[in-house]
């Protein structure tokens, strides 16, 4: 019975995934990869994770990516390696030779352009991607029960204004914090932090 409910939950979540119907990741193979590199990548699943600064819950182009993580999964043993790409990393964004911050690739052309730029500049082949916004992060942290963070006085000075903005952007309820020091943050408070 537990397995049935678990499978049902996973299917419900999968049905909530927003995908661009005009973008097929399999069309974004990296033509620049050497044959030996392609052979070395067999048995691995490479996923680009994009965290967008979206206040209207949109996930497509027009949003800057504040978080870019490349996750590489060894399918034989389940080992996962993560690499964070700094949003201000200056890379070649498209075929016309335009260089800019990598977070601009997603803003200009959504996941398609971001994946193409990452593949080309980092000599990788991204097999899949996921995009998440503030609400998804807040909901995930709430599901996990929150997080404990030590807030300095300087951080406390600003955080409540960001909490208000995050509540308005996500529609997820939260409360202002009362003091600096150790605080147990809910999802919205953690996103604001």
Segments and roles (model prediction):
Residues 4-193:
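Non-catalytic, solvent-exposed segments at the cell envelope interface
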């Amino acid at each position: 019975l537990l397995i049935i409910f678990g499978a049902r939950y996973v299917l419900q979540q999968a049905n909530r995934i927003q995908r661009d119907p005009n973008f097929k990741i399999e069309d974004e193979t990296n033509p620049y990869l050497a044959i030996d590199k392609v052979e070395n990548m067999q048995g691995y699943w490479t996923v680009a994770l994009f965290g967008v600064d979206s206040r209207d819950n949109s996930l497509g182009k027009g949003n800057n990516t504040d978080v870019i993580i490349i996750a590489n999964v060894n399918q034989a043993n389940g080992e996962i390696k993560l690499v964070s790409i700094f949003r201000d990393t200056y890379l070649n964004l498209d075929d016309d030779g335009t260089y800019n911050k990598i977070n601009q690739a997603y803003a200009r052309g959504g996941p398609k352009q971001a994946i193409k730029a990452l593949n080309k500049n980092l000599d990788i082949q991204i097999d899949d991607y996921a995009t998440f916004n503030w609400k998804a992060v807040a909901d995930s942290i709430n599901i996990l029960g929150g997080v404990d963070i030590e807030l300095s006085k300087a951080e406390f000075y600003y955080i409540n204004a960001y909490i208000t903005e995050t509540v308005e952007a996500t529609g997820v309820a939260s409360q202002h914090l009362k003091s600096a020091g150790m605080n147990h943050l809910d999802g919205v408070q953690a996103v604001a932090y």
